[in-house]
């Protein structure tokens, strides 16, 4: 290509192979268009301004080399080709492109420098080769334009044009792999879901010359997809991988059902004779040797089918007879069918396939089975009997509800049987038949099964516990006394808790008796007295002046309304800063009439203290009552909570119905007081009380007998008593009023809103 005069003289060859050396031929003999060979202007990639001009230069060079003269002339007139010229060279002289470039003789030219308008310019390419990038792309464009897709190069060396062939052929049950041979008939093999492949489009990888049909690895490929010319084909051995089995699907279904029956239902096995007959049914027909004709094979298969049908009919007849006998001997279900769980297979979770249910004649063939309960057997036979008649749903095994321990299921059936026996016997059903097992027939027979021995022991244990539970009500009836306190009903429990809350509020000692004891009271010997409703007798009152005739009635705790309505109000009794005042009939042994208007709090019945007054000692002396007051004052000095003391009988008149209440409010801090001071304070308090009572008796004011003595403690420990007599009055409407200057009931403590509402 050093010669510029011979660059564009090669001709287009029949193939796409280009040689590096051009063909030297005359231009006038080829085309009417002439090159301006004497012109110094030519097309070259050396002086290209940009990539577009570089592309145009190569396209022009391609058109000239392949003798596309008209296209080259049109492209030269329209496209912006990079034109060059050589300066300083003789016209028509042989110059080298590389030498001219090195010497700086080349220059950029324009289309105005072209002398001949009809002639083509020569091309002088610095990078001109047959394997250039642009040349290869132009070859591809040419092949796409002409539609030359079936060339030998594309067919032999392009792997992308080969079709994708499936591994397994479509609809070939005879060539099913060995690991899919035991599938039930309702399971679709994976080959039936594959897309169909036609014979024309099937083409094996490669040319197929090394394809051996006798190889066991190639047995999945159907022989109709392979031509007889390609591969080594042995016609005699074709029966090895494609046997002619007309009843392959039926035998596979029977085989799978019977295998699952003996594999997963060990507890439901039948005797030896039906098992042998079913094992004969499992055996596949043995294929005769290949030299025997096909007619003999078909005859043998027909004979085997007839034998199998006869065996099935015999088994069905035997089973029907056995079921009829069982129906006459034992009635149909005693166990509730809804309470019996489904029994899943033991190994169904490992295979991942739901086992199919075998026919009914293969499940139960015996009347009695050693490893199965009679209740369970009767239930399954009942379900299968109604299933055949279309009355019951089919028996399905759940994979999730699997029993890991068969003893749990056996214990469930035994408990159901015992419950049914006890219910029927207690109801006096004359037509009832026991569903317990015959111990003499089952337990006396020696068995090597550990489960059978364990079941008999378990049944004995359950029966013993059941008999023991029967004797408990009889023992309860025979007992005359109860050692522990018995709460009869829920209301008495609430009342008992209400009584305990009252004691906690009064800071009194909690005992098992009904109410807190009075002073000098001896606790009864039997502290565990039951809190039960009943007639408890009239109370015994210590003070004869306050004694009333109380008729016997029901326990007052039954109709008592609870004092605390919610949790928050109940907690007020336990607050340390609380100074809680209780009504008198909760603290003393006296009885308050129900119609008394001076009581602020809700009143129980008159028999509120019957339980305590039965054991009290009646002391009517005034000295004993004074001693009681002194003891209560000692308790007030030691405790910071308010207490209530009952005055002596001399301080009240016989006509008064409400005793006097002396409330002592003490500071939180404990102070030590000498014995002499306490004695003096007691004497002063007693003298003042006696004087008050005498004045009231002289005046004859019965309404002013209701007074409250508030005795606060000062810093010196001396008790000062404020008597509120004149200001307290009995109102006309029956309410009790007090002077707010000396006694403010709302400032005593944090009263609960429930108490105020009541």
Curated annotation (Swiss-Prot):
It comes from the Eukaryota. Residues 1-23, 191-220, 268-299, 322-355, 428-454, 587-681 are annotated as: Disordered. It is found in: Cytoplasm; Nucleus. Pfam families: LisH. Its main location: cytoplasm. Keywords: Activator, Cytoplasm, Nucleus, Transcription, Transcription regulation. Residues 51-83 form the LisH domain. InterPro entries: LisH (IPR006594). Residues 269-299, 605-664 have a biased composition (Low complexity). Residues 667-676 have a biased composition (Basic residues). One of its GO terms (cellular component) is nucleus. Residues 207-220, 345-355, 436-454, 587-600 have a biased composition (Polar residues). GO terms for biological process: positive regulation of flocculation; positive regulation of invasive growth in response to glucose limitation; positive regulation of pseudohyphal growth; positive regulation of starch catabolic process; positive regulation of transcription by RNA polymerase II. Belongs to the MSS11 family. Transcription factor that regulates pseudohyphal differentiation, invasive growth, floculation, adhesion and starch metabolism in response to nutrient availability. Interacts with FLO8, STE12 and TEC1. This is Transcription activator MSS11. It comes from Saccharomyces cerevisiae (strain ATCC 204508 / S288c).
